[in-house]
């Protein structure tokens, strides 16, 4: 992916945006990819190296990354696992997902989200429900007891 800086944002923001992008692997499907249409997903993978995005369009992505960084720095309790990537082979593909927090005492997966207040105004959380359901499934496949999931939403506006 080609990252541009057409609005001349500070260099650290541009550098962060460039360091954050990894080419997608052909046989790996990330949990967040499941919320995309199949054509969108495969076209993105096929043309990733041609795609262009300006750093000014990534500010809210950086905000979300900053929130996750703060949460990740919090001390993990003995009954908690945080920011862990799980993978499950399904045929020729690998389903890969990184959950934010699993609490073994509560048997709950927590996912931190940054969003607009409009997410709540429109009351459509189906994408979040799908994502956390897959995290629950991946954790169960890895041998953990999971009773459910919760979302901690931080609204940016």
Residues of each region from the PLM?
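Metal-dependent nuclease catalytic cores that hydrolyze phosphodiester bonds in DNA/RNA
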Residues: 1-109, 116-129, 140
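Substrate-binding beta-hairpin/strand module that engages nucleic acids
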Residues: 142-157
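Residue-level recognition of conserved beta-strand positions in structured domain cores
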Residues: 111-114, 153
């Amino acid at each position: 992916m080609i990252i541009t800086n057409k609005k001349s944002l500070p260099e650290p923001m541009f550098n962060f945006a460039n360091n954050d992008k990894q080419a997608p692997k052909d046989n790996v499907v990330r949990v967040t990819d499941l919320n995309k249409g199949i054509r969108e997903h495969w076209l993105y993978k096929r043309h990733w190296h041609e795609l262009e995005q300006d750093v000014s369009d990534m500010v809210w992505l950086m905000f979300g990354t900053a929130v996750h960084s703060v949460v990740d720095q919090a001390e993990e309790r003995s009954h908690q696992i945080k920011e862990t990537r799980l993978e499950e082979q399904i045929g020729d593909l690998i389903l890969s997902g990184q959950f934010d927090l699993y609490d073994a005492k509560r048997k709950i997966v927590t996912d931190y989200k940054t969003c607009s207040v409009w997410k709540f105004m429109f009351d459509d959380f189906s994408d979040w429900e799908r994502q956390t359901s897959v995290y629950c499934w991946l954790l169960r496949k890895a041998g953990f007891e999971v009773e459910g999931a919760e979302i901690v939403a931080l609204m940016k506006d």
